Structures are given as C-alpha cells and as structure tokens.
C-alpha cells in the first residue's frame, strides 16, 4: 500500500529525493558502503525509466523502508505533490545501467519480478558477460553478485523505444571508467546523465539529510569523492576520447538550444549534467571542459601526486590540485603512465 494518508506515520527510509526537472527525479541512497549513489527516475505515461538501482544496503539499521522498488511504489515524495513515483507499481520499469559496479546494480534483483527491461552498453559485452563478480567489484565488498539478463544492448548514438513508446533519449558510449560506461541524453529536458565518468568533489547543492563523506577511500582521508578508476577495466586513453566525444556532443546541443531559444527570449537553456554521485544539475559543457583540463594537466605531469596507496596489490595515486579544487582523481598509477606515453606531444597543457 502507498503511504499517502498520514505523512506523520511514514516509515524511516534510506532514500532521499529531489526533483531534477519536469519529468525526472533524483533518488539518493544513504547506503552502508558510503557511496551515496545517485539514481535517476524519469516518469513516462506507462513506464518508469531508472538510471541504476543503488546498493540495496542501508547505512542505518533503523531504516525500515530500504527497498528502492518499495520506495518508488509506496513512499510519498514532497516534490511530487506528496504522491509516490509509481503508485502500486502500475508502470513498467526500464533500467539503464550506467556501468556494472556494485553500488549501481545491487538493487536490480528487486525489479526482476516486474518483467523489467534492463539496458547496458554493447561496447564490450564480454566485460559484462564474463567475470561479473570481479568486474562489478562485488567480490571485493563480499556481496553476492546480482544475476540478471540484459534485454537491450545500447549502441552508440542510438535512440530507444519500447512497446510503441519513443522514450526520446539517446545513448552515448563512454568507456574509460569502465568499458561498459554508458551515458544518455534526454532530448526534451536537455539533460545528460553520465554515471561515474565524472562528478564534483563536493555537492554544490547540500543535501542536509546525508552525511557529507561520500566516496571516502579508507586509509587515504583526502580522497573524498575522487573521480575513481578501478584496476578492473579503467582506461585513461579511452576516457579522454570519451570526454572529447561528450564535449563535441554537448557543444552541438548547446548551439541548437541557442538557435532555438536565443534573444529576445532571454538567455537560452543549456545542457545540464547528472552524475552517479554528488552532482545532478551541473553545467555539462563547463564540467566536461574542467575535467578534461584536469586530466590533461595530470597526464602532462603538471599536477603532483598528493598521495598513494595499494589496493589489491596495485599502486593507486591520488591527484588534487588544491583544497579549493572542484575535482580530484584516484587511479592505478599505470593508467597515467600509459596515457602519458600515448599522448606524448599531443595534449595542449
């Protein structure tokens, strides 16, 4: 049943919601891993389109409503006129997997009984079909790897429709964080969703309900919310190509918006970006340029390593230009070395 009658009797929950735009909501999980994944819910007449499903692991044992699906189907959201996002589960679910890491896929099993359509990138199917327990990092956090089938393999620049409904979204393959990293663009809301390809170190808009320690790496206290690359599939050469592609895409979309909505209508809208953590309505063009510039400086050796540590026997370095910086990076050292060799004499910085 939906909790819409007496708001004072609501159960405690591990989820927090915000409205992103007219059709889309952000749901943040206050999880036991300290990841605080950002889950996006776009509402259609007959469907709910989810970007990722979170950790299915509450931080507080006092929370009584800890299932994402139950939250969507029963819990009133203030920004939705105190109505739940999918009353009684009457709308079908479609899940876009931004990538396969545990903090984004552990909630999938609760949706399988609803005949959910699951979408993932077809850039490197083997990465998803083989050794998912390792590639998802589930084995390293001692949690069972979810079992699910990909119903649609997303091709680069393709659009998506299902059962006669055109979703008006466009897929963008963005390998780098992982081979299966998948972004998508909302044609109507002018919003780009990029998963864990990048995000800010700190929330530009505070979420008072959450502890402010997302993404802390144990043993390296300054690494909070670094843009992280795993040993399992991380690749800076692919990543830089993905940033170039995203920048070209966003520049084109912003040019379109200027032509369609320029003066005398006032400042035109610009493409916004929603990330897998910490950022849900940043300026896409500015953020991509800033992140790309940071990586160019790191690759050029102009940003010193701020700290190092070993994870699973592999040396990881941490880069932070200053405490005022919007971004930081943590990755296996060899990724920077390989990128430095590849881009030698090419990058501007």
For each predicted feature, which ranges?
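Eukaryotic N-terminal targeting leaders
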Residues: 1-21, 25, 82-83, 256-263, ...
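Divalent metal-coordination and catalytic microenvironments
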Residues: 23, 42, 52, 99, ...
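Metallo-beta-lactamase
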Residues: 48-50, 55-57, 61-64, 159, ...
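C-terminal regulatory/interaction regions
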Residues: 297-349
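Conserved beta-strand hairpin/beta-sheet module of binuclear metal-dependent hydrolase folds
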Residues: 10-83, 184-200
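Active-site-proximal loop/helix segment associated with metal-binding centers of metalloenzymes
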Residues: 122-156, 197-227, 288, 296-306
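Residue-level signal for the nucleotide or nucleotide-sugar donor/cofactor binding architecture
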Residues: 22, 106, 234
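Active-site HxH/HxHxD metal-binding segment of metal-dependent hydrolases
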Residues: 57-165, 198-200
């Amino acid at each position: 049943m939906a909790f819409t009658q007496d708001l004072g009797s609501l159960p405690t929950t591990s989820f927090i919601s915000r409205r992103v735009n007219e059709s889309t909501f952000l749901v943040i999980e206050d999880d036991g891993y300290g990841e605080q994944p950002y889950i996006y819910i776009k509402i259609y007449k007959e469907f709910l389109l989810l970007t990722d499903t979170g950790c299915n692991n509450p931080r507080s044992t006092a929370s009584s409503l800890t299932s994402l699906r139950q939250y969507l189907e029963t819990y009133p959201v203030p920004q939705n006129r105190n109505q739940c996002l999918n009353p009684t589960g009457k709308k079908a679910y479609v899940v876009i997997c931004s990538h396969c890491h545990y903090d984004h896929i552990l909630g999938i099993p609760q949706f399988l009984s609803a005949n959910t359509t699951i979408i993932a990138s077809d850039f490197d199917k083997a990465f998803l079909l083989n050794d998912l327990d390792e590639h998802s990092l589930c084995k390293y956090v001692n949690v069972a790897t979810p079992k699910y089938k990909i119903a649609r393999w997303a091709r680069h620049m393709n659009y998506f429709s299902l059962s006669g409904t055109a979703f008006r979204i466009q897929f963008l393959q963005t390998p780098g964080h992982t081979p299966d990293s998948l972004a998508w663009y909302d044609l109507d809301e002018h919003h780009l969703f990029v998963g864990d390809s990048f995000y800010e170190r700190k929330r530009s808009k505070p979420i008072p309900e959450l502890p402010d320690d997302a993404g802390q790496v144990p043993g390296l206290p300054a690494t909070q919310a670094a843009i992280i690359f795993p040993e399992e599939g991380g690749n800076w050469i692919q990543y830089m190509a993905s940033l170039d592609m995203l920048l070209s895409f966003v520049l084109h979309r912003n040019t379109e918006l200027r032509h369609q909505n320029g003066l005398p209508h006032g400042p035109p809208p610009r493409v916004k970006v929603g990330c897998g953590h910490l950022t849900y309505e940043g300026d896409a063009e500015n953020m991509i340029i800033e992140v790309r510039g940071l990586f160019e400086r790191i690759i050029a050796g102009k940003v010193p390593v701020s700290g190092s540590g070993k994870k699973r026997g592999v040396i990881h370095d941490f880069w932070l230009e200053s405490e005022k910086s919007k971004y930081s990076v943590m990755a296996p050292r060899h990724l920077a070395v390989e990128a430095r060799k590849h881009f030698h004499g090419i990058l501007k910085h």
